[in-house]
A protein has these predicted regions:
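Short beta-strand edge/turn micro-motifs at domain boundaries
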Residues: 390-413
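Exported/periplasmic cell-wall-interacting domains
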Residues: 208-311
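Short, well-ordered alpha-helical segments enriched in acidic and aromatic residues
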Residues: 320-332, 336
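Alpha-helical segment of the N-proximal tetratricopeptide repeat
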Residues: 44-73, 77, 312-315
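Surface-exposed, charged secondary-structure patches
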Residues: 150, 346-394
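Gly/Pro-biased beta-strand-loop elements
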Residues: 132-243, 249-254
Length: 413
């Protein structure tokens, strides 16, 4: 290798490592709220990634000069984008020698930054994979069996692809608005206990929108907590909490694919788009190992079958026949520590207040989750006959043999 090439390669890795050091310092040190945050130029969500992928495309077409120019512009505008810095450095080095791999720096330098290089290569591969393996047109994640008009938006996360998908629900039809690169737990997925550094799998809902002024800079432009552990998690003895969708510190554009304590982390421009878009309490968040994309028509039979079960429950409740109604509840039903026998008086009180009036279920949504068991998360408004409104309830159903049984029921609004 020529002295000139060596200097360029060293310069590249120094750039990348310096960004990493800045990120580490931003993480470890107590941070004051930066006034510059509100003065930063507006960056469109997904823009930086799209520009990086364009650089990749130009490289693939052997248009090195154009790729170098675009990479230089990208790192000038986003100096904290470590992966872009690495690609830019490779393009500089390629002017004097052929490259062997992404992050092609001298062996001694590569050894000292081995973990960082490995993380950046993984991030690069996942971003390219997301471009190449797009969801088939007209498909949705299989978990979205039926959404109501109250669910104006929905989020689905595919951890195997390090990807978050943002949907808009219009007239019962889901439209994919955008998708973004994400980071998950250092130890991967399937959270079980507090402190295991894993991201949970399941069906959740956005519970709040935390004011960025109340957060450390480490969390970026904001945070959207979700309701982990949900009743299904609690049923299986899962512990922990504080799982958020949040941004990155100022010194870091994005994080390694597995870099969090269990949260889902996005680039700040991407998170800002999500924060501006989704609604609190009504936005479902599906976190899966791998999403199964299906046509809406293919899930209609399952939706209709479950709708029949739910209507049978409604009819039983309207009948005020306690024995008939309790047949829909699992023997191991649990409501925040109360078993079925302890919770039954509350159900009896509801029947007494209804005085035999019929009830209607409005704004019904079904979210289907399958792992070692088959579950359904159901949300609806329960409106007594003659009333204009009623409580919003959420039920968790479990398939037991050939029947669906309720193992949790609560009022959420």
């Amino acid at each position: 290798m020529s002295v000139q090439a060596m200097k360029r390669a060293l310069l590249v890795l120094c750039c990348v490592l310096s960004v990493a050091l800045m990120a580490a310092q931003a993480w470890a040190a107590p941070q004051k709220k930066a006034k510059a945050r509100s003065q930063a130029p507006v960056v469109r969500d997904g823009e930086a990634e799209a520009r990086l992928l364009e650089v990749y495309r130009l490289i693939g077409q052997a248009q090195g000069r154009q790729a170098l120019a675009k990479a230089e512009a990208l790192v000038t505008e986003h100096p904290n984008f470590q992966l872009a810095q690495l690609v830019y450095g490779d393009l500089l080095a390629s002017q004097s020698r052929p490259l062997r791999a992404l992050g092609d720096v001298p062996d001694a330098v590569a050894k000292s930054g081995a973990q960082l290089l490995s993380d950046l290569r993984d991030e690069s591969a996942l971003r390219i994979r997301a471009l190449r393996e797009r969801p088939p047109a007209g498909t949705i994640p299989a978990q979205f069996l039926q959404l109501s008009m109250r669910n104006k938006h929905a989020i689905a996360i595919d951890s195997s692809r390090a990807r978050l998908y943002l949907f808009e629900n219009t007239g019962g039809e889901l439209k994919l608005l955008a998708d973004y690169y994400i980071s998950v737990g250092k130890s991967g997925i399937e959270k079980a206990v507090e402190g295991d550094l894993r991201t949970p799998l399941g069906i959740y809902f956005v519970t709040s929108n935390l004011d960025p002024k109340s957060l450390k800079d480490f969390y970026g432009v904001g945070a959207l907590p979700i309701n982990y552990p949900n009743p299904y998690d609690a049923r299986r003895g899962k512990t922990g909490g504080g799982i958020w969708l949040h941004g990155t510190p100022p010194a870091q554009f994005s994080r390694a694919p597995k870099a969090t304590d269990g949260c889902v982390v996005l680039a700040n421009p991407d998170l800002q788009r999500i924060i501006r878009t989704v609604e609190i309490r009504t936005t479902p968040v599906v976190i899966a190992d791998k999403l199964n994309w299906v046509t809406p028509q293919s899930v209609q039979p399952d939706s209709r079958r479950f709708a029949d079960t739910l209507q049978a429950w409604r009819a039983a409740k309207a009948s005020a026949d306690m024995t008939r109604l309790l047949a829909f509840y699992s023997a191991d039903f649990s409501f925040y520590g109360k078993n079925l026998a302890e919770w039954t008086p509350a159900l009896r009180s509801e029947l007494d207040k209804a005085r035999g009036r019929d009830i209607q279920l409005k704004d019904v949504s079904y979210l289907h989750w399958t792992d070692s068991a088959d579950t359904m998360v159901v949300t609806f408004g329960e409106v007594p006959e003659g009333a204009r409104s009623g409580p919003v309830k959420r039920q968790y159903w479990l398939r037991q043999g050939t029947q669906w049984k309720i193992f949790f029921e609560g009022v959420i609004g």
